[in-house]
Amino acid sequence: MSTPARRRLMRDFKRLQEDPPTGVSGAPTDNNIMIWNAVIFGPHDTPFEDGTFKLTIEFTEEYPNKPPTVRFVSKVFHPNVYADGGICLDILQNRWSPTYDVSAILTSIQSLLSDPNPNSPANSTAAQLYKENRREYEKRVKACVEQSFID
């Protein structure tokens, strides 16, 4: 069944294949255009470098008027990532716009890895370490990077 959300997701997928952003990829699951698997590669010159972080993206029929639910499947130690993998990112909540597509969502999350917002923490321990003990923060991030090879 073709709906506006499904047609839009097909366009998003086509655009992602034709003009893939650096360091991110995503595709619908085999049998459901409304559920995607994605990968974000850790940005260079950050503690996340060399990591391969898996995510799921779940869309509703209200997409693109409502944002999808995006969750890390891989363990990520980050001030703006909840223990369950949920992501505290303004464009996925109150700053959402129907102009955002899957490519923009993934590149925004990749950018968040590079530039955390410790003032809006989803993980208070990570936020505190990011502000007060950067060496310990980076040590914990690197442990997640190593775990991402196994996941």
UniProtKB/Swiss-Prot annotation:
The reaction(s) this protein catalyses: S-ubiquitinyl-[E1 ubiquitin-activating enzyme]-L-cysteine + [E2 ubiquitin-conjugating enzyme]-L-cysteine = [E1 ubiquitin-activating enzyme]-L-cysteine + S-ubiquitinyl-[E2 ubiquitin-conjugating enzyme]-L-cysteine
GO biological-process terms attached to the record: centrosome cycle; centrosome separation; DNA repair; endocytic recycling; heart development; negative regulation of apoptotic process; negative regulation of DNA damage response, signal transduction by p53 class mediator; negative regulation of ERK1 and ERK2 cascade
Gene3D superfamilies: Ubiquitin Conjugating Enzyme
SMART domains recorded: UBCc (SM00212)
Gene Ontology cellular component terms for the protein in this record: cytoplasm; HULC complex; nucleus
Domain UBC core: 4-150
InterPro entries: Ub_conjugating_enzyme, UBQ-conjugat_E2_core, UBQ-conjugating_AS, UBQ-conjugating_enzyme/RWD
Outcome of gene disruption: Lethality during the second instar-early third instar larval stages. Mutants show defective synaptic function as a consequence of mitochondrial failure.
One Pfam family matching this protein: UQ_con
Localization terms from the record: Nucleus
Catalytic center residues: C88 (glycyl thioester intermediate)
Pathway membership, UniProt: Protein modification; protein ubiquitination
Root EC class: transferase
This enzyme's EC code(s): 2.3.2.23
Keyword Lipoprotein: no
GO MF terms, alphabetically ordered: ATP binding; p53 binding; protein domain specific binding; ubiquitin conjugating enzyme activity; ubiquitin-protein transferase activity
Assigned keywords, A-Z: ATP-binding, DNA damage, DNA repair, Nucleotide-binding, Nucleus, Transferase, Ubl conjugation pathway
PANTHER family given in the database record: UBIQUITIN-CONJUGATING ENZYME E2
Family: Belongs to the ubiquitin-conjugating enzyme family.
Role, per record: E2 ubiquitin-conjugating enzyme that accepts ubiquitin from the ubiquitin-activating enzyme E1 and transfers it to a E3 ubiquitin-protein ligase. Required for postreplication repair of UV-damaged DNA. Involved in the negative regulation of the Ras/MAPK signaling pathway in the wing by acting with the putative E3 ligases poe, Kcmf1 and Ufd4 to mediate the ubiquitination and proteasomal degradation of rl/MAPK. Required for in mitophagy.
Name of the protein described by the UniProt record: Ubiquitin-conjugating enzyme E2-17 kDa
Gene, per the UniProt record: Ubc6
